[in-house]
Amino acid sequence: MGKSPKEVLAEFQANMSKLQSAIPEVTADFTKRLMPDALKDGVLSTKVKELVALGIAVCATCDYCIAIHVNKCFEAGATKEEIAEALGVAILMGGGPALTYSTFAMQAIEDFAPEA
């Protein structure tokens, strides 16, 4: 069995910190400007934008991205049911690979869901 979503997220955060130290001039634009600006509330809420980002992450077959955006979906107020529906759209658009990566997203939902 592979790494859990929490392990994947922790690994990403540790390695991103190293990358930011090594090439801050490259990473700063993405992490400090582009990402916050793209995901802030606008006509679409941050929650909707995170659900879209999750669907793209699933279609891109990116474990790191899936772990990050499932966690961010919950932080933005999404429910398990809303996240599952977003996965359904990802499967529609991404086919078999998206279906496969949606199983990792389902584990991430269990790992990152707020305590009831």
Label each region the model flagged.
Residues 77-88, 113-116:
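Charge-rich, acidic-biased intrinsically disordered regions
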Residues 1-48, 100-116:
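Acidic, glycine/proline-rich low-complexity segments that act as flexible tails and inter-domain linkers
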Residues 52, 56-68, 93:
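Short, thiol/selenol-centered motifs that function as redox-active sites or metal-ligating centers
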Residues 35-36, 53, 70-74, 87-88:
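Amphipathic alpha-helical segments within well-ordered protein domains
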Residues 20, 42, 56-63, 77:
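Residues at alpha-helix boundaries and short interhelical turns
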Residues 84-108:
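C-terminal structural segments of small proteins and small subunits
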Residues 37-41, 55, 90-93:
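Alpha-helix C-capping/helix-to-loop hinge sites
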Residues 41-51, 65-82:
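Amphipathic alpha-helical hairpins
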